[in-house]
Amino acid sequence: MAFVLSLLMALVLVSYGPGGSLGCYLSRKLMLDARENLRLLDRMNRLSPHSCLQDRKDFGLPQEMVEGDQLQKDQAFSVLYEMLQQSFNVFHTERSSAAWNTTLLEQLCTGLQQQLDHLDTCRGPVMGEKDSELGKMDPIVTVKKYFQGIHDYLQEKGYSDCAWEIVRVEMMRALTSSTTLQKRLTKTGGDLNSP
């Protein structure tokens, strides 16, 4: 009995370690969470986007980078994680609480956090030594600049209802792109530890 228990413990440790893959499999649940987050964002619509046309802005979504094949697997994972983290940061603020239906906002933040938690199981093994060697990766800097532009826009517009509506629509674009990136990673086997 002790031998079987030891063997099971060793299997678990190997599977979740840098050489294993169980902790880094991009599951179907991650995709379902992504779809649910998009559905919630759609339901958060309070204003007609047409009534806010004067507030439109091109935030410069790095769509080609996110949806194209420019990124290596570890970079793609990092970009996906950063996009979800920054999306969470946009909606997890005191100012966003005043703009949206609290229940839908909480559900969206919970859904984004669940996606991040799932990806966190991969973060160490995937990022590991490569991240420290690369320092600040250009794709991550691009994503951060994109989201900084969104934060700056909200502040510039005084967090108005129209500004939030424009950002909601933009976040739907961003999360749709991140879902495309998730699909691409899943097609590569979803196992982000594989070579």
UniProtKB/Swiss-Prot annotation:
Glycans are attached at N101. Residues 1-23 form the signal peptide. This is Interferon tau-6. Belongs to the alpha/beta interferon family. IFN-alphaII subfamily. Paracrine hormone primarily responsible for maternal recognition of pregnancy. Interacts with endometrial receptors, probably type I interferon receptors, and blocks estrogen receptor expression, preventing the estrogen-induced increase in oxytocin receptor expression in the endometrium. This results in the suppression of the pulsatile endometrial release of the luteolytic hormone prostaglandin F2-alpha, hindering the regression of the corpus luteum (luteolysis) and therefore a return to ovarian cyclicity. GO terms for molecular function: cytokine activity; cytokine receptor binding; hormone activity. GO terms for cellular component: extracellular space. IFN-tau genes are intronless. They evolved from IFN-omega genes in the ruminantia suborder and have continued to duplicate independently in different lineages of the ruminantia. They code for proteins very similar in sequence but with different biological potency and pattern of expression. Keywords: Antiviral defense, Cytokine, Disulfide bond, Glycoprotein, Hormone, Pregnancy, Secreted, Signal. It is found in: Secreted. Disulfide bonds join C24-C122, C52-C162. Constitutively and exclusively expressed in the mononuclear cells of the extraembryonic trophectoderm. The keyword Disulfide bond applies. It comes from the Eukaryota. InterPro entries: 4_helix_cytokine-like_core, Interferon_alpha/beta/delta. GO terms for biological process: defense response to virus; female pregnancy.
